[in-house]
């Protein structure tokens, strides 16, 4: 069946009365915890986030530090959520809250527990620390509620037990629930957006900008604009004329773009729960607070590799491929350096991995341009039991290194991550001690 024919059939169904989100349709709720980090900080202080100017940021880093969150009260003043500290007008007085990532994770876990009182974990997909999707299709009849009433029930429970305000989107698929929350909920008094395929086309086919829509970035928006396409309706109509040029431009991603233009989403909650990636990886990355020289950045690469190896060892995993990514000060307009090195066989040996990453760094890094971002990634990770050791491996040396790694891990688990350090971790350029006290690159 063509897209056009499918659209015409659904249009006829709606004419016969099938256009609303009803009990016999899939019903997805997408819930977002409003200005989550900032709201948590307000709750902890007994303040109202809708009446309090509060910023979650670490001003000790620099005045260019990006705010992790601001309260709705500050958004109402026209201040952007992900602004930098120096971009906040001097006339605006506000409270600065240092990030407390562990606290936010604790709140998020508590809220997840609230959801579990109403639905099974198999019907919840945690999208981020402050956002989740819930398939309530099989619960509406049980609770004698509509999908919107179910959303209200969950939002009220979160508010009553944590003090955190939420917004929600209700849709007939994952995509529509997300869009209902991201776009529609902002313009309704109860902060609950509702969409099905038909109301989506009626309400949002002319919506601008395209970058407001999930998974459409500024580059895609700009590329489409070059062809006179500025709305989802434009994409849908273009797909009716000819899909080929969209596939030539975006490859396989064109299928998702076209589906979303029509309000379709083939991925279901069960697909997410049953998905298992064929390849797994572990990574460690950080943004540096100033330009690092070639030698200083090598210290950081070693520290990150140390932590990555220990993570592999602790989880009983090995890697057979390592990738290093280096980005430079944007003022130099220097393209990022990236390289990958393969190991002879899967390993979590500190020496083998460190040697491989160091050599890769020496090969790809620019020695004369300030370095600002680094990421080390262990690719193709697999359980250690799958590894076949070579006849050329030295069993005594291997055992010695494993015993050392095990001892280091035990000490760190018992006394803290900074209990054992290399001498280089005490250098002024080192970020090792500070990073070990963070969660996700921010203060715990």
Role assignments for model-derived ranges:
Residues 134-155, 228:
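Catalytic palm subdomain of template-directed nucleic-acid polymerases
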Residues 30, 212, 222-368:
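DNA-contacting surface of Y-family translesion DNA polymerases
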Residues 127-131, 171-174, 317-321, 369-373:
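Short Gly/Ser/Thr- and Asp/Glu-enriched loop/turn motifs at secondary-structure junctions
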Residues 150-208:
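Long, highly charged, low-complexity intrinsically disordered interaction regions
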Residues 40-42, 66-69, 176-184, 247, ...:
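Short acidic, glycine/serine/threonine-rich loops at helix termini
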């Amino acid at each position: 069946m063509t897209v056009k024919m499918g659209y015409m059939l659904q249009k006829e169904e709606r004419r016969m009365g099938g256009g609303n989100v009803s009990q016999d349709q899939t019903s997805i709720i997408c819930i977002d915890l409003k200005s989550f980090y900032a709201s948590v900080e307000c709750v902890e202080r007994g303040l109202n986030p809708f009446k309090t100017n509060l910023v979650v940021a670490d001003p000790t880093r620099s005045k260019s530090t990006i705010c992790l969150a601001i309260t709705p009260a500050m958004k109402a003043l026209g201040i952007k959520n992900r602004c930098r500290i120096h971009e906040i007008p001097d006339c605006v007085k506000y409270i600065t809250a240092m990030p407390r990532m562990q606290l936010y994770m604790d709140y998020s876990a508590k809220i997840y527990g609230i959801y579990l009182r109403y639905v099974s974990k198999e019907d919840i997909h945690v999208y981020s620390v402050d956002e989740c999707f819930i398939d309530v299709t099989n619960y509406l009849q049980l609770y004698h509620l509509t999908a919107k009433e179910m959303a209200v029930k969950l939002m009220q429970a979160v508010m009553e037990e944590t003090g955190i305000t939420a917004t929600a989107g209700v849709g007939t698929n994952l995509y529509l629930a997300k869009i209902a929350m991201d776009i529609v909920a902002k313009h309704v008094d109860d902060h609950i957006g509702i969409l099905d395929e038909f109301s989506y086309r009626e309400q949002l086919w002319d919506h601008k900008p395209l970058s407001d829509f999930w998974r459409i970035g500024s580059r895609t928006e700009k590329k489409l604009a070059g062809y006179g396409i500025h709305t989802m309706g434009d994409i849908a109509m273009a797909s009716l004329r000819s899909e080929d040029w969209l596939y030539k431009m975006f490859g396989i991603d064109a299928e998702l773009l076209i589906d979303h233009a029509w309000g379709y989403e083939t991925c279901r909650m069960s697909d997410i729960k049953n998905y298992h990636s064929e390849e797994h990886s572990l990574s460690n990355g950080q943004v540096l607070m100033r330009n690092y020289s070639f030698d200083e950045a090598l210290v950081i690469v070693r520290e990150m590799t140390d932590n990555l190896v220990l993570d592999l060892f602790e989880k009983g995993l090995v890697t057979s491929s390592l990738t290093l990514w280096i980005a430079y000060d944007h003022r130099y307009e220097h393209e990022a350096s990236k390289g990958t090195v393969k190991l002879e066989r899967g390993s979590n040996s500190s020496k083998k991995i460190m040697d491989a990453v160091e050599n890769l760094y020496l090969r790809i890094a620019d020695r004369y341009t300030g370095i600002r971002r680094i990421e080390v990634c262990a690719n193709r990770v697999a359980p250690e039991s799958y590894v076949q050791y070579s006849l050329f491996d030295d069993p005594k040396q291997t055992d010695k290194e494993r015993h050392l790694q095990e001892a280091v891990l035990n000490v760190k688990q018992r006394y803290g991550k900074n209990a054992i350090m290399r001498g280089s971790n005490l250098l002024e350029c080192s970020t090792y001690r500070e990073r070990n006290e963070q969660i996700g690159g921010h203060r715990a």
